[in-house]
Amino acid sequence: MKKLTVAISAVAASVLMAMSAQAAEIYNKDSNKLDLYGKVNAKHYFSSNDADDGDTTYARLGFKGETQINDQLTGFGQWEYEFKGNRAESQGSSKDKTHLAFAGLKFGDYGSIDYGRNYGVAYDIGAWTDVLPEFGGDTWTQTDVFMTGRTTGFATYRNNDFFGLVDGLNFAAQYQGKNDRSDFDNYTEGNGDGFGFSATYEYEGFGIGATYAKSDRTDTQVNAGKVLPEVFASGKNAEVWAAGLKYDANNIYLATTYSETQNMTVFADHFVANKAQNFEAVAQYQFDFGLRPSVAYLQSKGKDLGVWGDQDLVKYVDVGATYYFNKNMSTFVDYKINLLDKNDFTKALGVSTDDIVAVGLVYQF
């Protein structure tokens, strides 16, 4: 409670530090356009768990470019990088990272093709509930874990409005090349060849969507499961299917997703579940004066975890709010109420059961 009081006080202080900003268009001439965008998220976590307590400030910088080749053909590219702001200068940039780096071509109503580091098609559904002020999106959409979040080697085809014939009907197909990260510290971030699909339909604020993806697993991942089947999945393929619903109109945002994964979901940073059933739901309301309260529930249950049986991997209620001073400046508080109980499973594998409060001040353009 003491840390929560401190966190709320920090939000009040951050409100007094608000300032205005403007977006940056670098170039727009002769059918060529280049936009620069970025964000500074000055934030702090408060938690009884030392690993989740402290400064987590970062900055992101990126650009989006577009060139009109002819009436039906457009080239585009995007790059985004994150710089950590909570490290000593002597520690260098080892934790900085590339989020996005891809380029492609758009063929009018016939869709677009791009290649590079991008979002997996499974995130087309996962993104609907990954909208909390700070937390969220952590039951099954994970960075560098097959096709559920950002990762490398994606070739993606996207088609919006179904060839220009049906407004709101979008679909995508994706291929991911092999990324064999064989060192054990990063083995969960590897993948074999894979493919995935997604489809969404949105009409007057309502949306429905589904996705499916399947990939080969690397030899390191499969062999780890043979050695320790209690904590490492041993299947040769990783699969995910997910479905989602959302409503986004009249200042109201409601969304829910359900998914199941096989030999894919990472828990406690190092281990992989044989199977996981995942549920996320979020509700938000945007007041005209800038306040956006948020409440959510997220749960991931691991199935058939060897001697551990079925166990909750993630389970929490999230209560938070964002206040927008204008389109460039905002502040937030987000309270993750962890519902996991301390037991033999969480203690043995290092699964956190502590609450976290995050507060921050964000400038973006």
UniProtKB/Swiss-Prot annotation:
Gene3D superfamilies membership: Porin (2.40.160.10)
Predominant location: host cell
Domain of life according to the entry: Viruses
CDD domains: gram_neg_porins
Source organism of the structure: Enterobacteria phage PA-2
Function field: Forms pores that allow passive diffusion of small molecules across the host cell outer membrane.
One Pfam entry name: Porin_1
N-terminal signal peptide: 1-23
Family as reported in the entry's similarity comment: Belongs to the Gram-negative porin family.
Additional comment: A porin gene can also be found in the genomes of certain lambdoid bacteriophage, and its protein is expressed in the lysogenic state. In E.coli the expression of ompC and ompF proteins is then reduced substantially.
Membrane-topology descriptor: Multi-pass membrane protein
Classification via PROSITE patterns: GRAM_NEG_PORIN
Protein name as catalogued: Outer membrane porin protein LC
Annotated compartments: Host cell outer membrane
One annotated Gene Ontology cellular component of this protein: host cell plasma membrane
Keyword tags: Host cell outer membrane, Host membrane, Ion transport, Membrane, Porin, Signal, Transmembrane, Transmembrane beta strand, Transport
GO biological process assignments: monoatomic ion transmembrane transport
InterPro entries: Gram-neg_bact_OMP, Gram_neg_porin_domain, Porin_dom_sf, Porin_gammaproteobac, Porin_Gram-ve, Porin_Gram-ve_CS
Binding partners and assembly: Homotrimer.
Record GO terms (molecular function): porin activity
